[in-house]
A protein has these predicted regions:
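Mid-to-C-terminal alpha-helical segments outside catalytic/metal-binding sites
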Residues: 222-275
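Short acidic/histidine-rich active-site segments
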Residues: 50, 197-215
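An N-terminally biased module of ancient metal coordination in phosphate/nucleic-acid-related enzymes
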Residues: 1-83
Length: 275
């Protein structure tokens, strides 16, 4: 791996396979989306079209859906490789857990040929039994990454559920846009709380490849820099996502404590004086 590769921003969550979900509709939008990501400094991309886990219960329907995905992916990969030869462009899936007992053995459901799988639950609502599902997936040999937990409606204000997810070996992926209010105040607040606990393992764009949509990468990085989060940026945007490409577990991310306020510095000074 070259020095440039080691510093390359990597993204694990986007929708750039043309015409298969609510992301890029055409090959032109795929190429435009990749170009916009490279302009933001992203050089490693695992794009993740939606697929419902319930399809794995119906072999014929699953095969038809994956054949459709494979054909569109082949066209996208050829075009991206030709136009952006320096981009490491791979495919996974964002798996919708619409059943409690999914079979995710098919390697195409994993992120870029790794053992990691990107997961979400339907309609941004959490059903009962999410911990049990994650345990079963872990026992089956997959490494679950929960996509954008901050976006779930009324989600886990006490963070007890996140604690359980992490205890059973799940990882968490936060959207850049959440840090700047893209999904509302509640999602933004929870996003920063999770960073403050050190419980986020990856940042990703969740970019849907449409011309009117933004990446929010630069805006989010600026906010993190303002919060003294340079180490977190490096781990969440570069180091840990790159480790997925090598099928390696993420490194621990320290809690984001933010800049010390004037009041905090004053209290520290007074305590020193008293001591």
């Amino acid at each position: 791996m070259t020095a440039d590769d080691q510093l390359a921003v990597a993204d694990l969550h986007s929708h750039l396979v043309p015409g298969v979900d609510d992301g890029a509709r055409t090959l032109e939008e795929t190429l435009d989306g990749v170009e916009r990501m490279t302009q933001a400094g992203i050089r490693k991309i695992i794009t993740t079209p939606h697929v419902d886990a319930s399809l794995t219960r119906e072999p014929a329907a699953f095969s038809e859906r994956m054949d459709e995905m494979d054909d569109a992916w082949a066209r996208a990969l050829e075009a991206v490789t030709e136009r952006f030869p320096d981009v490491d462009f791979r495919r996974g899936q964002e798996v919708m857990l619409d059943v409690p007992d999914p079979n995710l053995a098919d390697e195409r459901l994993r992120l870029g040929g790794s053992s990691f799988v990107l997961l979400e639950w339907p309609r941004l609502q959490l059903p009962p039994g999410t911990v049990d599902v994650l345990v079963r997936l872990r026992r089956a040999g997959t490494r679950p990454i929960v996509a954008h937990p901050e976006r779930y409606v009324g989600f886990d204000h006490g963070l007890e559920l996140v604690t359980e997810w992490r205890r059973v070996g799940a990882y968490l992926q936060l959207n850049y846009g959440s840090l700047v209010g893209r999904y509302g105040v509640e999602a933004r607040t929870l996003a920063w709380r999770l960073l403050g606990r050190g419980w986020i393992d990856y940042l990703a764009t969740d970019f849907h490849g449409r011309p009117h949509l933004k990446l929010f990468w630069r805006e989010a990085v600026q906010k993190l820099e303002e919060a003294a989060g340079e180490e977190q940026i490096s781990l969440l945007s570069v180091t840990n996502p790159q480790r997925v490409f090598r099928d390696e577990e993420p490194l621990p991310v320290p809690p984001l404590l933010g800049k010390r306020t004037l009041w905090t510095r004053l209290r520290e000074f007074l305590n020193l004086e008293q001591n």
